[in-house]
Amino acid sequence: MSHVRRFDHVGLTVADLDVVTAFFVALGLEVEGRTFVEGEFLDTVCGIPGSRTEIVMLKPPGEGTRLELSSFVRPDSVPGSPAAMANELGLRNVAFEVNDLQAAVDWAATEGYGLVGGIGEYEGAWRMAYVRGPEWIIVSLAERIG
């Protein structure tokens, strides 16, 4: 018996909600909603009494897994490891299939977000690159080529 019904979302905690939201909206995601959450529910689920967070839920075009961005109002966020590379344990990247990888990489560069490495090709099927986005988030961009 499977306990999972579907993959709902991935959550990222960020410091500057507006900057990170703008990046993902410019990439092609849509804002589904924005709200503050606090009280017993958040305290219980997060295990942080007295917490308050602002959340933006983003959705991809069509259907698919959503991206939840959360910025804590209280308590203050705890810094992560901004220079984390792909081999560091934990959540390392958020991945999106794009129509034109080079155009997406060029756009990211004009916004000040460079490649982690380079553009690679996998078995004639995919071209992919990691971009270091706002707040050092690694964003995987992949184009199906075969």
Regions found by a protein language model. Name each.
Residues 1-21, 27-33, 90-96, 142-146:
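N-terminal beta-strand motif that seeds the catalytic metal site of vicinal oxygen chelate
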Residues 13-64, 103-104, 110, 129-132:
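Core segments of cupin and vicinal oxygen chelate
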Residues 39, 74, 145-146:
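A short acidic/small-residue loop/turn micro-motif
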Residues 39-44, 77-81, 117-118, 122:
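A cross-kingdom feature marking solvent-exposed beta-strand/loop segments within repeated
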Residues 66-69:
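Helix-adjacent hinge/juxtasegments
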Residues 124-126:
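Short, small/polar residue-rich loop motifs at catalytic or cofactor-binding pockets
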